[in-house]
Structure formats: C-alpha cells, structure tokens
Amino acid sequence: YVYTTRQLVTLMNNEAELAGVMWHEVGHVAARHAQRRQQTQQQNTLLGAAGAILSGILLGDSQLGSTLGRAALQGSQLLTLSFSRSQEEQADQLGVRYLSQAGYDPMAMSTVLESLARQSALDAQLQGRDNANLPEWASTHPDPASRVRDAATMAAGLPGTTLNRD
C-alpha cells in the first residue's frame, strides 16, 4: 500500500504536490527499497556483530576491546543510514520523473519538500529541539535543503505544467 497522513496533506497547496508525495512513495515500491533495506540491514548487523566478536577474541575484555566492539556495531548502523539516504534520493528522482510523465508540474516535488522542511523546522523549534544541528550522516533522510534544491534541479526543463486537474 501507498499512503500519506492528514498532517502531510495539510501542507500541500495543490493536487500536483499530493501526486508528488504519492509518486515518491511509489518510487520506493518500484525500486524495491524495503526489501533492499532489510537485506542491507541484516548484512550490516552481521558485519558489526562479527567485528565486535573479533575484537573481543583478539583484545579480550579490555577497555579497548569493548570500545572497538561498540564501534563495529555502531559503524554497521551508520552504513544502513547511508543506504536509507540514497534510497530517499532515488525515490525523489523517481517521483519527479513520474510527476512529469503524468503531466503534472514536476516542480511540485520541490515545493512540497520545501513545505515539509519548513514544518519540520517549526515542529523542532516548538518542541525545544535544535533539528538543524543533526548531522546528515546520523539521519535516514538527506538534508532537507539539499532535497529541495535537487528536486528543483531535476524538474528543470521537464514537461508537465498541471497543478490541479479539476
């Protein structure tokens, strides 16, 4: 299934932005991201566990052995995060292309991502969090400003001008 939330729908200004979100999600399905992410996560977890076990065998129960074991496990998690970011970028690219092919304005992906980024920043501010300081390598999604810019660049020159069909 492909779905969205009411909260996300309230951020949308037109039908093309809704189509952009839906096409982004269809892009995840078409590229089999869920299956690939699960496989990658399993492989990375096994790799991290092997590194932790190996450091325990070679270095014993020393402080260095414990530190290297934790680093191996955390490193495997960071590899999975990087994979998730690349999947989001690919889904954005597919969403822009599908928007254009359906006759919608492909810039709608950029504008809805911009609205989402502004709302996320506002939510963080209202909750007393400084979301801007979260480094990209620690996130499952690419930097919001980069996503907006990349989507606009991808959309430039593509056909499609419809914002609302009715």
Predicted regions and their residues:
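Soluble periplasmic/extracytoplasmic beta-strand elements of cell-envelope proteins
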Residues: 1-7, 19-22, 30, 114, ...
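Short pre-active-site segment immediately N-terminal to the catalytic Zn-binding motif
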Residues: 3-20, 81-86
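Catalytic Zn2+-binding segment of zinc metalloproteases
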Residues: 16, 26-43
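Short alpha-helical scaffolding segments that buttress acidic/His motifs in well-ordered protein cores
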Residues: 22, 71, 75-76, 112-116
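Secretory-pathway/luminal and periplasmic proteins that interact with or process carbohydrate-rich
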Residues: 29-30, 56-62, 118-126
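Acidic/histidine metal-binding catalytic segments
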Residues: 38-47, 64-68, 103-113
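Membrane-active amphipathic alpha-helices enriched in small hydrophobic residues
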Residues: 43-61, 67-79
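Extracytoplasmic and endomembrane cell-envelope/extracellular-matrix remodeling and assembly machinery
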Residues: 79, 84-166
